[in-house]
Every structure is written in structure tokens, then in C-alpha cells.
Amino acid sequence: LPFALQDKIGVAKNHAIGRNRYIGYLISLATRSYDGMRVGLDCSNGSTFNIAKNVFDALGAKTFVVGNEPDGTNINMGCGSTHIENLQKLVKEKNLDCGFAFDGDADRCIAVDENGMEVHGDYILYVCGKYLKECGKLQNNTVVATVMSNMGLFKAMKRENIDICVTTVGDKRSEEHTSELQSLFAIS
């Protein structure tokens, strides 16, 4: 990369205080300890490289991480949620319980099970929706899904008497409907 011109050089700031507050906030959202769990993380050399491990470790998990060496040019390059093969290999080789691959800005996460197999978002939405309903915490008895969601999700939610708000694909639309319905989560 070419060097920046002297008059165009920005200012580097240490955001450790904000990062640590954010880590504390994420930890506060957890409803249980992860003691004894072995978790793989692929941080895509992106924004979670110095956050995700801290969160899982603080919750008691033993974490193993790949994609946590950003150099400013390697975000999402052969790693993260668009290349889960690194995480799958890590989970299988280390005999982990599960794994999570984030994209560079951490607005997407792909999960894998103990065999390194991808756990699809529709299944995660079903499990979370059902759990929240059982706990009495599913706002408006509704989850938000996209038009790309599998018909099996709709049938399973109907069986659980959970409503689905269907939106077009994209974070913006999912977020709009989630806010409008005061829903806790969505899949986009």
C-alpha cells in the first residue's frame, strides 16, 4: 500500500475503554455460564478479533481462535463467515463443542456444530424463538425472517404458535421490522 501523504495522515485513537465497556455489555446479556464448553471462533481478521474471545472466555468457555490477526488489508480474506472451512477444520481437529464465524464488521455470524457442520440460520431462529416463548420473553410472540427462509421454518413456527413477520432480504429491512415489532432478534 502506498503511504499516506503527510497532510493526509489521520489520528490513531485507543478505543480500549469503549471496547471494554462493550465487552462488559455483551457479557451482561448472557443468561448462563459457558463453563466446560470448548468453542471455536473465526474473527475474519475484523472487528471481533479482540472482542469475541474475551466475551467467551469471561463466560467460562475455553476458546480457540482463527482469523484474529488483522493487518488492515486482510479482513474477510479466506476466513470468516464467507469461508467457514477454517472454522470447520478447527472445530473437528480440536474436538470442540461448536464454533462461530463472523464477518468483518460482525453483522453476520455463521454457526457450526460439534462435527463442523453449518447450523443454518432458520434452525437457529426456530430454537431461539421457541426458547424465548417458553421463557415468556418472546416479544409480540413474533420472530422476523426473510423471504429466503425455508418453508420448514414457517411450518415449525406455526406448530409452536409463533408468528413470523416476513421481510425482504437485508439487514436494514430486518432491523426495521425488528424495531417496529419490538422483537429481540431477526434473521436477514
Residue ranges and their predicted role:
Residues 50-54, 76-79, 109-115, 123, ...:
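Short acidic, glycine/serine/threonine-rich loops at helix termini
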Residues 176-188:
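Single conserved hydrophobic/aromatic residue that forms the stacking wall/gate
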Residues 98-99, 104-115, 179:
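Self-splicing inteins and homing endonuclease
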Residues 44-50, 106-107, 149-151:
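Gly/Ser/Thr-rich loops at beta-strand to alpha-helix junctions
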Residues 1-92:
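Gly/Ser/Thr-enriched, mixed-charge loops and adjacent short helices
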Residues 26, 42, 84-88, 100, ...:
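Buried hydrophobic positions in well-ordered alpha/beta secondary-structure cores of metabolic enzymes
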Residues 2-23, 28, 115-175, 179:
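Proline/glycine-rich low-complexity loops and linkers
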Residues 91-96, 137-138:
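Glycine-rich phosphate-binding loop signature in dinucleotide/nucleotide-binding domains
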